[in-house]
Amino acid sequence: MRFRTLLIAFLALCLGLITACSEGPANAVNPQDLTYDEILNTGLANKCPQISEFTRGSIPIEPGQTYFVDDLCLEPQEYFVKEEPVNKRQEAEYVPGKLLTRYTTSLEQISGKITVDEDGVVTFYEEGGIDFQPVTVQLPGGEQVPFFFTIKNLVGKTEPGFSSINSSIDFEGDFRVPSYRGATFLDPKGRGLATGYDNAVALPATADKEDYANVKQTPIGKGSISLQVTKVDQATGEIAGVFDSEQPSDTDLGAKEPVEVKIRGIFYARVTPEA
C-alpha cells in the first residue's frame, strides 16, 4: 500500500515536470514555419517570431548608408490605462487592463528604412504594413476602453555614437494615431461625420450642443514609443527586443476625452543593407 502511494506521487511529479518543460518550446514557435491548418484557431498567428535567448551579436552600420527593415512585428503583452484619482490629493496612475480582443492585437509585416548620420544617430522610418489594430481592454471596475493600437509614420531615433545595431540600442520617437472610427461610421442614433443624420434630438435648435454628441469628429492623436533591442543575429540580420508605447484611446468620434493607454510587449524585425 505504501509502495502504491509512493508510485502515484512519483508519477505525478514526473507529469508536472513534463508539463513545465513543454511550456517553453510551445511559446517559442515561429508562425512562419507552420502551415495554415497548423495555425488555424490556435492564436499562433498573433505571435511574433523569436530569436534565441543566447544571441548577442551586432550588425555594422555606416553613415550615409540606407538599411531596409522587413517583417517588423510588435506583439503586445501588457496593457495599462491612466485613471484619474477619486481624491484630488492623489495623482493619476496607470491601472492594468484585461484584454478583450482575441487573436488580432499584433502589428506585423511592417516595413521601413534605417539611416545613420555622421554623429552616429540611427533613425528608423516606418513606411507601411499591417500597422494598426483596434483593441479593447477592460478595467477592474468594468469600464471598457477601446483604442487604435498603431505606430503609423513612426520616426524613431537613437542617441549619437552608434556604429552598429547591438543589444544596447534604443529607438525612441513619435507616431500618428488615427481615429478609432471612420468618417462614415454611424452611431446607434444614425449620426455620423460624412453621412447619416445631423442630430437625433426633437428640437433642431439644440443640434449643435456638445452634450448630445451631435458634432462628430475624427481627430488625429499622437503617441510615443521606445523600441529597445535586446537580441541581434548578425548572420541572419534579425533583431528582437521589447517595446513600451503610450498613446491616446478612442474619443467616440469626438464625444469624449481620450485617456492615456500604455502598451508593453516584444518586437521582431529583419535588417538588410540597401542593394
Swiss-Prot record:
Query: Where this protein primarily resides, as one coarse class?
Result: membrane
Molecular function as annotated in GO: oxygen evolving activity
Keywords from the UniProt entry: Manganese, Membrane, Photosynthesis, Photosystem II, Signal, Thylakoid
Q: What is one GO cellular-component annotation here?
A: photosystem II oxygen evolving complex
- Which segment of the chain is annotated as a signal peptide? 1-28
Q: Which InterPro entries match?
A: OMP/PagP_b-brl, PsbO
Record-linked Pfam families = MSP (PF01716)
Q: Where in the cell is it found?
A: Cellular thylakoid membrane
Q: How does it sit in the membrane?
A: Peripheral membrane protein
Some GO term, biological process aspect, for this entry: which one?
photosystem II assembly
Tell me, in a sentence or two, what this protein's role is.
One of the extrinsic, lumenal subunits of photosystem II (PSII), which stabilize and protect the oxygen-evolving complex. PSII is a light-driven water plastoquinone oxidoreductase, using light energy to abstract electrons from H(2)O, generating a proton gradient subsequently used for ATP formation. Required for dimerization of PSII and for binding of PsbQ to PSII.
Q: What does the annotation say about its assembly with partners?
A: PSII is composed of 1 copy each of membrane proteins PsbA, PsbB, PsbC, PsbD, PsbE, PsbF, PsbH, PsbI, PsbJ, PsbK, PsbL, PsbM, PsbT, PsbX, PsbY, PsbZ, Psb30/Ycf12, peripheral proteins PsbO, CyanoQ (PsbQ), PsbU, PsbV and a large number of cofactors. It forms dimeric complexes.
Family (UniProt): Belongs to the PsbO family.
The protein's name in its UniProt record: Photosystem II extrinsic protein O
The species this protein was found in: Crocosphaera subtropica (strain ATCC 51142 / BH68) (Cyanothece sp. (strain ATCC 51142))
- Classification of source organism: Bacteria, Bacillati, Cyanobacteriota, Cyanophyceae, Oscillatoriophycideae
Instruction: Identify the gene encoding this protein.
Output: psbO
